[in-house]
């Protein structure tokens, strides 16, 4: 959650090929950043439907705004019961990032892609 927040905030300043977020702690009222621009060409989120730490709606809202992939899977915050599923999703993410002709060197909003 906190790692997802930090990764996404950092990706606004550092060019990265992709950001993989697990139940990211977004839209927390007392935190400094409430908007999340990113230079990452690929952003993907995994969030458990039964998460009682970070509201799943926060990931849904961000995915809609950023136009990124969102995987809502069975499980709570740590997703301990869905590790094989998370591994499969992450492997697919890595393959898409590796095979993408897009670059992450141009600034843009989250989810913005270079033309193919």
Model regions and ranges:
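Short alpha-helix in the alpha/beta-hydrolase fold that links the catalytic acid
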Residues: 55-63
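Conserved serine/cysteine hydrolase catalytic core
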Residues: 29-42
């Amino acid at each position: 959650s906190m790692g997802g927040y930090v990764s996404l905030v950092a990706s606004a300043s550092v060019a990265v090929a992709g950001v993989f977020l697990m139940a990211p702690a977004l839209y927390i009222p007392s935190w400094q950043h409430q908007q999340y621009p990113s230079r990452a060409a690929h952003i993907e989120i995994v969030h458990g439907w039964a998460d009682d730490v970070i509201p799943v709606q926060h990931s849904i809202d961000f995915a809609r705004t950023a136009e990124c992939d969102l995987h809502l899977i069975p499980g709570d915050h740590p997703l301990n019961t869905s590790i094989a599923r998370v591994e499969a999703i992450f492997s697919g993410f890595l393959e898409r990032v590796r095979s993408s002709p897009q670059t992450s060197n141009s600034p843009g909003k989250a989810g913005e892609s270079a033309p193919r």
